[in-house]
Amino acid sequence: MADTDDKKAFDLAIRLLGEREHSRKEIITKLERRKFSEAAIDKTLERLDQLGLIDDRSFAEHFVGSRSRKKPSGKYKLRYELFQKGISETIIDEILSDYDSSAHCLDAAMKKFPFLKGDDHYKRKKLYAFLANRGFDSHSIRETLDQIFRS
């Protein structure tokens, strides 16, 4: 019985990793939701480690890169999301150390700006709230708004 449970847990983990890269915590959470035993989960993680299929650093790099392209976010939001996915503070700090918040802030603002209606004061207020919600720091937001409304 335990062997089939181990195999099912491993097969599910492989299927999940085939869809996209996952953090260690995500794999654990998804296996726990399916009611796999702690022993089966531990064996699955051990096998995934041996095969080099689970790597939190690689996951974090891909996650930040994907976010940067699809839905630019600030360091605060990225830090929170990575922490929620079980990435260690050390890895998060290393990955985000060379993240250019100002460039991504401008990119996010330029994508949103054409859809804003109203006078400049209203647009500025809405854009500030949008960027703050995306996790950008106030300094980057002010620089971006000054750059947009200067032209």
UniProtKB/Swiss-Prot annotation:
One of its GO terms (cellular component) is cytoplasm. Keywords: Cytoplasm. Signal peptide: none annotated. Transmembrane segments: none annotated. One of its GO terms (biological process) is regulation of DNA repair. The keyword Cytoplasm applies. Gene3D superfamilies: Winged helix-like DNA-binding domain superfamily/Winged helix DNA-binding domain. Belongs to the RecX family. HAMAP family: RecX. This is Regulatory protein RecX. The lineage of its organism: Bacteria, Pseudomonadati, Chlorobiota, Chlorobiia, Chlorobiales.
